């Protein structure tokens, strides 16, 4: 089997999206890989991320590969959890404080930062519409994030999301109040919940 044939198999195995480190881990040199990229017409979707020309580009998955600490949050997380019917105009992510988000912002992503010890709280994994697994904050964390960022969020979006959350069978009010205390939004959230529940 030639190295190009091996790369064809790898590309298929990874669903048409491949990263340079995956190629190197399979014993193929960068020079052979770059010749393959040119020969097969792969597109560079991000630094070290290449996509086959016959593969639909999954922007959310590419963003996750590009910045693996990014967690989909705010309006994007609402959309994942069916707590809104509005498809986000921009994808919203949260990264740890200290990460430089300027490149992501230049590329049209809305980026929030949070201290390291709160970054992983409420993280779950969900499937994009293309079937790729990406990190997303759970419903309870998302509600708290919306309240924390209420100056940047339309209040109607928050209220509609909270109404949808109240109807959910899998809501976890105990977790919601725990997160509200952690993120210092408990006093803001409580009156909304009293009206809805």
Language-model features: where?
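A short, conserved structural fragment
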Residues: 40-46
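Generic detection of intrinsically disordered/low-complexity segments and helix-coil linkers/edges
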Residues: 27-30, 44, 159
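Residues that cap or flank secondary-structure elements
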Residues: 11, 24-25
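Short amphipathic alpha-helical interface segments
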Residues: 1-16
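Short amphipathic alpha-helical interaction segments
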Residues: 26-38
